[in-house]
Amino acid sequence: MAEQKYKFYMQKVLKNGTAIGETKDLEVDFVGLRYSRAKGINDIGEQRVYEEKIAESSDIRVFIPETPVYEQTSIELILYFVGENRYDTYNAFNDFVRTGFTKYWDSARNREFIFYVKDEIKIDDELWYGSVPYLKVSYKLQNIKGYTEKHQK
């Protein structure tokens, strides 16, 4: 049985999802970048509802919008940068991802979300494995809708 090779993509977008940049295949366009995992990608944020408690009643008034709106969720994206040019690739990826809004999707889940980078970016570990040096970096991404959607090809 052949091993399944998943692909991981990002694209610069406006907040409404309109593309403003080229699609980047992360492991092709950033030579030496290796995807590890995206923790929290399947999480759904808390639904926003309005509740009103009235002193004279044991009932509670609740307003639930027809179109659900969710709190933003955080996704931890863990990447490795390997090889001789690992710092160049790390810096090029940071230049790409740290400004504005970016859409992420992959061929494993076929789900997409729009995010911005919230917290500082720093190298978790600089490790040497055999003769191939690599950097491990965790990125904290804020999913602006609080959920993922089916990727539209």
Place the predicted regions along the sequence by residue.
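Extracellular/virion structural assembly segments
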Residues: 2-153
